[in-house]
Amino acid sequence: GVKLRSSGIKLPILILHPQIDDFDEILEYNLEPNIYSFRILERFLSKSKKHPFHLKFNTGLNRLGFKIDDVELLYNILGDGNNIKYLFSHLGASDDVKEKAFTMGQIKLFDTISKKMSDKFNKVFNKHLLNTSGILNYHNYQYDMVRTGIGLYGYGNDDEYNKKLKPVLTLNSVISQIHNVKKNESVGYNRGFIAEKNYKIGIIPIGHADGISRALGNGKIGFRINNQIAPTIGNICMDMLMVDITNIDCKEGDMVSIIDDKNQTAEEIGNISDTISYEILTALSSRMKRIIIEN
């Protein structure tokens, strides 16, 4: 939030999980905190009784938020409630069609909480509830605002929606060095790969410290070099990985495509890794250079 504000963003910025030590900066940079417990509420009010915040309710995810039985005490603490900018909650399974009954139960409870708050405070509150999957699957409940998260990266919650979205990032690296590995030689930590024949391998300067899971070693995935797939060899290292380029015409310095929007998306890497695209994208290290391309 501070970086966005310092970069010239003037629109409201919601801080979803603030800590008590963050409150001074929240006030200084005019950020809007999520207030989710009485401990956080009381400490924030000790800093400012007028600064706007978003009040979060737990409707079934059982992560953060007040419960419906807390409304009376919230009223006693907040009085007119003029510093409540939004009421909100978070859906726990909006991407799963098999959990529609659960999700509709969350929505109904959120509506009940919102009405109880409005009746108690004698005012109508703005509300937000939906994440990307919620927008796609429960668009009738957008209320006053939505929280598009992974949708901004061009990913939805199923293949049909993904076809209509364009992933916004690619991840590339280069071949740092090429080695000829002889039969019976090993590659990588713990001798994770033993050559049963002669190989040519490429060393790529990206590893699990950058978000490339160690589970993707030993051929679990391949990366594109000069439009050919080079499977991983050996274990993924912290800062490097090795690939088989025996049958690929390439040289040191050639580009290696790790993630792209056509041949190998974050969704596909997530499927190979037995996880989701969220984990792949959020794991990408801040030490990797970002290049922003404007159309």
Where are these regions (language model features)?
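Active-site loop/helix belt of alpha/beta enzymes
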Residues: 42, 46-52, 57-174, 181-182, ...
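A structural signal for short, hydrophobic beta-strand segments that form beta-sheets
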Residues: 15, 175, 232-233
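C-terminal accessory subdomain/extension
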Residues: 180-295
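A structural micro-motif
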Residues: 11, 31, 51, 82, ...
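Electropositive phosphate-/nucleotide-binding environments in soluble metabolic enzymes
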Residues: 20, 35-38, 65-68, 100, ...
